[in-house]
Every structure is written in structure tokens, then in C-alpha cells.
């Protein structure tokens, strides 16, 4: 199913790369999203070394793209807080908060990565990108139905 995500990324005007210079700089980095170059990258060696799943990492990074297309949170409060408490282990929450990044954005992405199938993320990305290209204002706090 990783090919479905790659195809959805291409339809959205993105390139998926299996490496990036940042991967060598940070062996714990699994992937990232470069807005300026419209590139989502996977750190394939790190993913293998950590025993992670490339499809899950790509799904996570594409949810970050969807967050950017929607220019805001995808889940409304208090739903986000309730789901995060029920789904994400407290140690992981503390690690994200300590990282100094936008904690709510990252936690929302981790939550949705766990909750949404590859098919849903692919559909959501292609629909969001198409609406964005048409200049349609995309409502936030809207999760598509699972096909």
C-alpha cells in the first residue's frame, strides 16, 4: 500500500524521496516534509535500523502535508485531547513536548497516523491538494469518511 501513498503524493504535486541529507545528520530521524521543495522524504536506513514501517512513516509525513494544506488543526477540541489521552502513551507525549517542536501539531499527526488507514490518508491528501489548487478554502477539523 505504500505505492498508493506515493501515487497520492504525486497527484498532490509532491515528490517522495527515500533519503535526505538530514537523515545522515540525525540517525533517529525517520522522515520529514520539505514545504519549499514539495518533497516528503523517508530515512530508509533509519527506518530499517529502528524496525519501523516505511508505510506508517510516509502516512505520518503526508498527514503533516494535510495539516499544512488545511492551515490548522485537523481535529477539534476537546476531541483531540480525549483521543490523545486514550491513544498516545504518556511517555511519548512527554517526549514530543520536550522536543520543542509544535507539540499539538505533532501529537495530532501521531494520533491520526494510528487511527487512519493508508487509503483514507491517500484520499484525504488528494482531495485536500485538489481543493487547494482550486483556491477553495478547506475547512479544518474535518476527517473524511473511511471508504
Labelled PLM ranges:
Residues 48-57, 99-107:
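Soluble non-cytosolic domains of exported or imported proteins
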Residues 62-79:
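Catalytic Zn2+-binding segment of zinc metalloproteases
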Amino acid at each position: 500500500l505504500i505505492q498508493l501513498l506515493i501515487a497520492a503524493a504525486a497527484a498532490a504535486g509532491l515528490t517522495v524521496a527515500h533519503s535526505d541529507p538530514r537523515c545522515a545528520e540525525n540517525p533517529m530521524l525517520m522522515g520529514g516534509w520539505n514545504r519549499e521543495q514539495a518533497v516528503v522524504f523517508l530515512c530508509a536506513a533509519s527506518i530499517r535500523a529502528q524496525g519501523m514501517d516505511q508505510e506508517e512513516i510516509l502516512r505520518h509525513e503526508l498527514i503533516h502535508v494535510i495539516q499544512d494544506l488545511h492551515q490548522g488543526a485537523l481535529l477539534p477540541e476537546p476531541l483531540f485531547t480525549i483521543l490523545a489521552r486514550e491513544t498516545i502513551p504518556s511517555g511519548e507525549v512527554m517526549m514530543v513536548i520536550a522536543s520543542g517542536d509544535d507539540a499539538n501539531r505533532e501529537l495530532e499527526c501521531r494520533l491520526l497516523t494510528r487511527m487512519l488507514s493508508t487509503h483514507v490518508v491517500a484520499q484525504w491528501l488528494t482531495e485536500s491538494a485538489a481543493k487547494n489548487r482550486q483556491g477553495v478554502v478547506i475547512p479544518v477539523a474535518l476527517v473524511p469518511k473511511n471508504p
